[in-house]
Curated annotation (Swiss-Prot):
This is Glutamate-1-semialdehyde 2,1-aminomutase 2. The gene is hemL2. Its EC number is 5.4.3.8. The keyword Cytoplasm applies. It comes from Exiguobacterium sp. (strain ATCC BAA-1283 / AT1b). PROSITE patterns: AA_TRANSFER_CLASS_3 (PS00600). Its cofactor is pyridoxal 5'-phosphate. Gene3D superfamilies: Aspartate Aminotransferase, domain 1, Type I PLP-dependent aspartate aminotransferase-like (Major domain). The lineage of its organism: Bacteria, Bacillati, Bacillota, Bacilli, Bacillales.
Length: 434
């Protein structure tokens, strides 16, 4: 195999003195996989092309937003037409209302919605709303669940924080961190203990209904139902962070897929069609507490801007229930291919999937929480990642991130990926003497 990264290496060297780590988001530095970042030049459908001329089947999809693949022609045309009219005005547009109607129609928990500019903004605003609505202070989250980089949520977070081996972030005051409780994901007993001790001051529970930032880890049967019951019994709000799972796991998001309705939902990624968007919404009586209708303040200069609204609206409008049936079929085939290759070459493996999200761990232990995710062989993942990139498969450069499918991925793409996995696992068997 010949794999050239000459131009990417040069571009990274140029970037490093100008931006912290040479990147604008930590995981893009590729530190955990020990290689030069892949500098993208263009995308088309299920493919991304780097500045060295390498072509990849893309399972990153800009970390999830591109559910229709790169440069979907309908979305591209809609963005171009809106850009001719203007891209931000600082006053309402009809597009915001159309987008709100669509989101409310699709998401079971949302009766009113507020648009913001990122998933982090959405989760921060949802926590403020939960505290303001309940009059309580503390929030319960789960180890390994990442809810953006807001101070009160960078406590035992997953994703890039897990990749860097940092349990928390410097700069988060201990006094602020003390308002955030953490328990293991999929552990209802631990949740009950937390409520027994702090229930009078717990404003809410925030959870990824299917965790995507410790690798991909779905909820165990009864876990989400248990959270719904416990929060209702204790007067706390249940907040689903569906920034990643929203419109990815199912047509009606993860809450529709798993059949559990929260009080508040945070959205992002897919709802922007690849442009910066976030949103939070929920029961009308709760959302009516947001300014200017209520006393809880939240605002944003570019919130609901027409370019993001048209990209998101056009993306969501194209998604139909049958697309999710195809996602299930293709993700199932991908999981089957990984599993068969793992068994054939004696590679430790565990696979998880739901809708268009897929996860693979280099461990024989069934991964149900962050501690088990951390048992994965990171040295093996590092070698695997480099070999797969050289074979033209673009994966998230972290063991603690999930993979994404798009409507542009074909059966041929899936089979090519499985063939690359087979060849890579064969080499790993020899490299690690398995």
């Amino acid at each position: 195999m010949t794999y050239n990264q000459t131009r990417s290496q040069e571009a990274f060297e140029q970037a490093r003195p100008l931006m912290p780590g040479g990147v604008n988001s930590p995981v893009r530095a590729y530190k955990s996989v020990g290689m030069t970042p892949i500098f993208a030049e263009r995308g088309e459908g299920s493919r991304v092309y780097d500045i060295d001329g390498n072509e990849y089947i893309d399972y990153v999809l800009s970390w999830g937003p591109l559910i229709l693949g790169h440069r979907d022609p309908v979305v591209t045309k809609a963005i171009q037409e809106q850009a001719e009219k203007g891209w931000t005005f600082g006053t309402p547009t009809e597009l915001e209302t159309k987008m709100a109607e669509l989101v409310i129609d699709r998401v079971p928990s949302i009766e009113m919605v507020r648009m913001v500019n990122s998933g982090t903004e959405a989760t921060m605003a949802a926590l403020r709303l939960a505290r303001g609505y309940t009059g309580k202070t503390k929030i319960l989250k789960f180890e390994g669940c990442y809810h953006g980089h807001g101070d009160s949520l960078l406590i035992k977070a997953g994703s890039g924080v897990a990749t860097l081996g940092l349990p928390d972030s410097p700069g988060v005051p201990k006094e602020l961190a003390s308002h955030t409780l953490t328990v293991p994901y999929n552990d209802l007993d631990a949740v009950r203990v937390a409520f027994e001790k702090y229930g009078d001051d717990l404003a809410g529970v925030i959870v990824e209904p299917a965790a995507g930032n410790m690798g991909f880890v779905p909820p165990q049967p009864g876990f989400l139902e248990g959270l719904r019951e416990i929060t209702e019994q204790n007067g706390a709000l249940l907040i689903f962070d569906e920034v990643m799972t929203g419109f990815r796991v199912g047509y009606n998001c993860a809450q529709g897929y798993f059949g559990v309705t929260p009080d508040l939902t945070c959205l992002g990624k897919v709802i922007g069609g690849g442009l910066p968007v976030g949103a939070y919404g929920g029961k009308r009586e709760i959302m009516e507490q947001i300014a200017p209708q209520g006393p809880i303040y939240q605002a944003g200069t570019l919130s609901g801007n027409p370019l993001a609204m048209i990209a998101g609206y056009t993306t969501l409008s194209q998604l139909k229930p049958e697309h999710y049936e195809e996602f299930e079929r293709k993700a199932d085939r991908l999981a089957e291919g990984f599993t068969q290759a793992g068994e054939k070459y004696n590679i430790p493996h565990d696979t998880n999937r739901a809708g268009s999200m897929f996860g693979f761990f280099f461990t024989n232990e069934k991964v149900t929480n962050f501690e088990k995710a951390k048992s994965a062989n990171l040295e093996m993942f590092r070698s695997y990642y480099q070999k797969m990139a050289a074979r033209g498969v673009f994966l998230p450069p972290s063991q603690f991130e999930g993979l994404f499918l798009s409507t542009a991925h074909t059966d041929e793409d899936i089979e090519k990926t499985i063939a690359a996995v087979e060849a890579t696992f064969k080499e790993l068997q020899e490299e690690f003497s398995l």
